[in-house]
């Protein structure tokens, strides 16, 4: 079960798509790298994407609003 920051319900399909994108990113990082990416490095890379993910969630929120979903604005977490 994925934790979504902010008081908003994002449809499962959107979460699945986002998760697939993260998996593809991880896979690409592995195949592009000449060296073995250590677990901690992978975590560091993932958390470097934190701001990107916030933007993604904000954009998804806007999209859902345009589609007529009753959503509240996302509150960026520290």
From Swiss-Prot:
Induction: By light. It catalyses: glyoxylate + L-serine = 3-hydroxypyruvate + glycine; glyoxylate + L-alanine = glycine + pyruvate. Inhibited by aminooxyacetate. This is Serine--glyoxylate aminotransferase. Its cofactor is pyridoxal 5'-phosphate. One of its GO terms (cellular component) is peroxisome. Homodimer. Its EC number is 2.6.1.45, 2.6.1.44. It comes from Triticum aestivum. Belongs to the class-V pyridoxal-phosphate-dependent aminotransferase family.
């Amino acid at each position: 079960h994925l934790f979504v920051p902010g008081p908003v319900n994002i449809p499962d399909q959107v979460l699945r798509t986002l998760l697939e994108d993260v998996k593809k990113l991880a896979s690409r990082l592995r195949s592009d790298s000449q060296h073995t990416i250590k677990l901690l490095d992978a975590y560091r890379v993932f958390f470097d994407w934190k701001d990107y993910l916030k933007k993604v969630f904000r954009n998804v929120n806007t999209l859902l609003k345009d589609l007529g979903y009753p959503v509240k604005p996302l509150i960026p977490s520290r």
